[in-house]
């Protein structure tokens, strides 16, 4: 398809460094034309931080670019190749419905991928139509922006446009395209792909590119590829800990959904936990609970082991030594994760200093919460504002005993009680994207064309630590239901 190159002053300052890699990593591919694109939602705060022109992006020409009907002059549209272990099984994948326009360089010199998701068939579509539905694209917009506000590394959503076409899934749905912004789209699955089907030199090219883009300090190290492995492990330890601290269940932790940059990616079957339960699963296809909330750290370790395997030819000339180096690096994940998680949990309880018994104090609280079906987010909110009596834990003897131990623990630090409260307020969100509130917003937008419900939700989610009365509506639990909430891989 001939590219429709245009000069439109959107503020996009595109480079195409990924195309400097060997051609095994991508295929030149233009977005498919759509009949009647209309702007559904535009992320003005992200536009500002990227140095883009909001007025132009929301104009007719800007919408044509966001829909893929027109291509910025500097863009070299590509779809990226990658593989992945999906539910433990290796398979060839790739961008089946996404086109990378290029890398936007911000006025501050930062580099971000600009990708159109739902932009048509690619060589990696595997029989799919390459399209996306409006509901799942809006859902990714909501959740990714909520994650960003919570301080969790994530891809961002710049815009969603409707395409004016219908797509067939179980039923007929409105088509849409999401503009995703990411530090990069390099995945563990990208390395798995070249490890399986490429040469060692192509693997080295990808590793060098990744070092240059994300870990430049690695060039000065004795073993830069070990440094790469260690940095990815550290970033994932930090990321997974942050997920656990807010009760986020990703739902599809396949290796193609683990980024090298340490950002959360792919918001298909994800959801936030209400009642605390380590076995919480939302994805309709995760029937054995592989990606359950409590198993996410273990899956991260497994994924990182797959990443380490791809780097073996680069880690050492002796295969046995390479394996030892990789195993030692991956074995560090558990400690790194636990340190990050414990640090975050201490903050949620207003604890500044470290004591060996802290882990037992934390685990005892979680055990009590699990036993009585306490809401994860609202329990910590209640502890922050001293109104635990309003929760299911109020009046429970076990909790009262724990509470006394916690209060005693707070006396064993120099910081004043007021400082502890401030720490808790900045560590315990009052509002998360509750599943029923997200569905409420999506139903209004998709079925009725009313985006006001979504806009109000996004406003509340943008200030999770403000603890204002206006947020109370979004912190309320769903009505008791006999049907557990389920998610699907729509995004």
UniProtKB/Swiss-Prot annotation:
Disulfide bonds: none annotated. The active site is at 256 (proton acceptor). Keywords: ATP-binding, Magnesium, Manganese, Metal-binding, Nucleotide-binding, Nucleotidyltransferase, Transferase. InterPro entries: SelO. It is an enzyme of class 2 (transferase). Its cofactor is Mg(2+); Mn(2+). Its EC number is 2.7.7.-, 2.7.7.108. It catalyses: L-seryl-[protein] + ATP = 3-O-(5'-adenylyl)-L-seryl-[protein] + diphosphate; L-threonyl-[protein] + ATP = 3-O-(5'-adenylyl)-L-threonyl-[protein] + diphosphate; L-tyrosyl-[protein] + ATP = O-(5'-adenylyl)-L-tyrosyl-[protein] + diphosphate; L-histidyl-[protein] + UTP = N(tele)-(5'-uridylyl)-L-histidyl-[protein] + diphosphate. ATP binds at residues 94, 96-97, 117, 129-130, 180, 187, 266. Belongs to the SELO family. Nucleotidyltransferase involved in the post-translational modification of proteins. It can catalyze the addition of adenosine monophosphate (AMP) or uridine monophosphate (UMP) to a protein, resulting in modifications known as AMPylation and UMPylation. This is Protein nucleotidyltransferase YdiU.
């Amino acid at each position: 398809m001939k590219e429709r190159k245009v000069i439109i002053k959107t503020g996009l300052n595109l480079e195409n460094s990924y195309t400097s890699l060997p051609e095994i990593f991508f295929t030149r591919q233009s977005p498919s034309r759509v009949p009647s694109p209309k702007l559904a939602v535009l992320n003005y705060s992200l536009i500002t931080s990227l140095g883009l022109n909001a007025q132009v992006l929301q104009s007719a020409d800007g919408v044509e670019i966001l829909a893929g009907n027109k291509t910025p002059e500097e863009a070299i549209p590509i779809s990226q190749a990658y593989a992945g272990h999906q539910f433990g099984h290796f398979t060839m994948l790739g961008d089946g419905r996404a086109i990378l326009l290029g890398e936007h360089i911000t006025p501050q010199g930062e580099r971000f991928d600009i990708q159109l998701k739902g932009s048509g068939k690619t060589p990696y579509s595997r029989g799919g139509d390459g399209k996306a539905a409006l509901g799942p694209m809006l859902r990714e917009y909501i959740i990714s922006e909520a994650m960003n506000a919570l301080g969790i590394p994530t891809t961002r959503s710049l815009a969603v446009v409707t395409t004016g076409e219908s797509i067939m899934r179980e039923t007929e749905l409105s088509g849409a395209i999401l503009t995703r912004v990411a530090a990069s789209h390099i995945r563990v699955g990208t390395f798995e792909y070249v490890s399986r089907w490429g040469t060692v030199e192509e693997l080295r090219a990808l590793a060098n590119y990744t070092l240059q883009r994300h870990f430049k300090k690695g060039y000065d190290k004795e073993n830069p590829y070990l440094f790469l492995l260690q940095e990815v492990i550290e970033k994932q330890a930090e990321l997974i800990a942050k997920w656990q601290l807010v009760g986020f269940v990703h739902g599809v932790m396949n290796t193609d959904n683990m980024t090298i940059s340490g950002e959360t990616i792919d918001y298909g079957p994800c959801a936030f936990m209400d009642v605390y339960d380590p076995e919480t699963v939302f994805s309709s296809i995760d029937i054995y609970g592989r990606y359950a909330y409590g198993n996410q750290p273990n899956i991260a370790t497994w994924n990182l082991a797959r990443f380490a395997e791809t780097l073996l030819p680069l880690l050492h000339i002796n295969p046995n030594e390479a394996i030892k180096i990789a195993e030692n690096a991956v074995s560090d994940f558990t400690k790194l994760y636990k340190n990050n998680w414990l640090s975050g949990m201490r903050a949620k309880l207003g604890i500044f200093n470290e004591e060996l018994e802290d882990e037992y104090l934390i685990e005892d609280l979680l055990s009590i919460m699990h036993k009585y079906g306490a809401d994860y987010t609202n329990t910590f909110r209640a502890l922050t504002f001293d109104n635990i009596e309003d929760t299911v834990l109020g009046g429970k003897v076990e909790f009262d005993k724990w509470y006394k131990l916690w209060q005693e623990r707070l006396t064993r630090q120099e910081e004043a009680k007021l400082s502890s409260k401030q720490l808790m307020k900045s560590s315990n969100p009052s509002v998360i994207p509750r599943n029923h509130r997200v569905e409420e917003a999506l139903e209004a937008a998709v079925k009725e064309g009313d985006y006001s419900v979504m806009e109000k939700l996004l406003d509340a989610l943008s200030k999770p630590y403000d603890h204002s009365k206006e947020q109370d509506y979004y912190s309320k639990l769903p009505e008791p239901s006999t049907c557990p909430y389920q998610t699907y891989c729509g995004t």
